[in-house]
Amino acid sequence: VDFPSVLDDLHEFEMGTWQGLNFVSQQTNKSPIWEEFVERFEFLGVENYVHDLSKKRDHLIEANWMLYVDNYLEGFHIPFVHPELNDALDYSGYTTEVFENGVLQVGEAKEGEISFDLPETHPDFGKQIAAYYLWLFPNMMFNFYPWGLSVNIVIPISPDKTRVLYRGYVKNSELTEEGAGGDLDTVELQDQDIIEKVHKSMYSKIYDRGRYSPTREQGVHQFHRIISKIYEKLV
């Protein structure tokens, strides 16, 4: 009786497009998230980037997915874990901006290192920007470099296993080995090593959570706030 009805329909998900990239959401969004970044990223012309299969990577990490996100959002470790990246970035000019469902980290280049050619109307005009690192809750990371875009998709497998998909979209192939985005494989493996060590250390009897750095861990704090709000609704 009354079959089929609207109750039998397949579920429709909200879909949006920004500069050739398609996004699907299981929840209704008040406004497209990219509207907040028009001034920052519109000049890039991402729709003209070329998908480069040589930059495709699939990583399996022996750690919880939230530790991977923590590490991505925390600039504190750069001088200690990433010597090559630290050589390209002016650490004193590394900044973090938070918003409702994400975090933007901005890395300035050291003198002589490759940086974006920013238009005069850009909010960062006058600065030597080496990279923009954008995280959208819960598991999307967009890394913008002068050569193009590297996307990280973080997929939880189990409490102690995480899959990370790397995808690359190239604007200028001559710059792929230059600056902050010049050796992503090395940076990724350095990150994985420290993430797995942190995961193991959290099982120690003497482990206790530390305090947040007010200048280097604003992104981590924002991530934890989002997670906490979700848990509060479930209780």
Name every feature range the model reports, one short phrase each.
Residues 13-235:
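C-terminal catalytic domain of Rieske-type non-heme iron oxygenases
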Residues 1-16:
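Long, hydrophobic, well-ordered secondary-structure blocks that form the structural core
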